[in-house]
Amino acid sequence: MATLSLDQLSIIPNRTPPHKPAPQASDAQRMQMVQLACAPYPQWQVSDSELRRSGPSYTIDTLREFATPHNQLVLILGADAAALLPVWYHAKHLGEYCMVAVMQRIGSPFDDQQIRQQLPNLVITQIPWAGIDISSSAIRQRCAQGEPINDLVPANVADYIHQHHLYGAPRD
């Protein structure tokens, strides 16, 4: 948060995007896991705004909902998601509502040149990420194989996944 000078961080679990298969956890379960993960951080707010919305989940709609004249929104994305920005729904309007911060994994350079050419009004900043190399796919794969995930998610989230047998987590 300090790197981007943020006063607050809003974590917004998304509905199933139109381009992805249905999730293995319900909206309520995903919301609960995010709330558990964010509980220790008072400046992190969890919003169910996308989960309450009917129809497809588009980032531009969420940005419009959160935009006010007195705040600067920052959309934080991983490099994999940021690379697809030009094909997002109403991508050319993203810069009207936010700037984009791309979390760049150490050793994985992210070239934003093409994005800047296609979306010239979008301000993009890159933030080096030295944290744990995590992917939702790796978490689901480990769960399905009965392997521990405590090194990838907070302990309370790992417990929740195990208790609710999500992502193929074995039953006791």
Role assignments for model-derived ranges:
Residues 1-172:
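Nucleotidyltransferase catalytic core that binds NTPs
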